[in-house]
Amino acid sequence: MQMNILFFGPNGSGKGTQGAILKEKYATPHIESGAIFRENIAGGTELGKKAKTFIDRGDLVPDDITIPMILDRLKQPDCKNGWLLDGFPRNRNQAVKLDEALQEAGLGLDIVIEIVLDREIAKNRIMGRRLCVNDNNHPNNIFIDAIKPNGDKCRVCGGELKTRSDDQDEAAINKRHDIYYDVVTGTLASAYYFKELAEKKGKIKYLTLDGSPSVKEVTQELVSKLK
């Protein structure tokens, strides 16, 4: 079953984890907008060179560079049976432009997924992350009962734990969440554009998931709704 999917969720919602699970289960590439920029810049593509001039100045890359870059990635052979796009769009105007560009390219969306999570819970999850020095993939979080560390040691292997500085920067977390949770000019505004399309035209399916349960429970709900 081909699925062209757009994924929304705040930092701390487990969006990246669920994206990785879908990638494995359905052999669907999980494409992050940030990775597209890095690949194009590293590869020295024309679009990458243009994007780099803006990034080097600390400016946002214009949509007329970003969207063609995304389309180029979605046209790659590994996306022929579907794809999962994460990290773009981030406002309603970008959503409209992306929707139009996808349709013109024959890459119309099938499904939009929104992981819903209370903002305070999302922030606590980020600040509660602890990284195992032996393996970053060992999940430890002081605010999630199912994966609480064993004291100050990794719950999986007993290794030492550390924190990432950006996970403890509450001001930076709040700034990212300000952008995401803004339903007028932020990321949720772009998600709701697609929700309106789903309700009015019925051409795409809009799925909402409760992000508060365990990873396993969220995955079960997601897989069930994708059937």
Q: Residue ranges of each PLM-predicted region?
A:
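Glycine-rich phosphate-binding loop of ATP-dependent small-molecule kinases
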Residues: 1-227
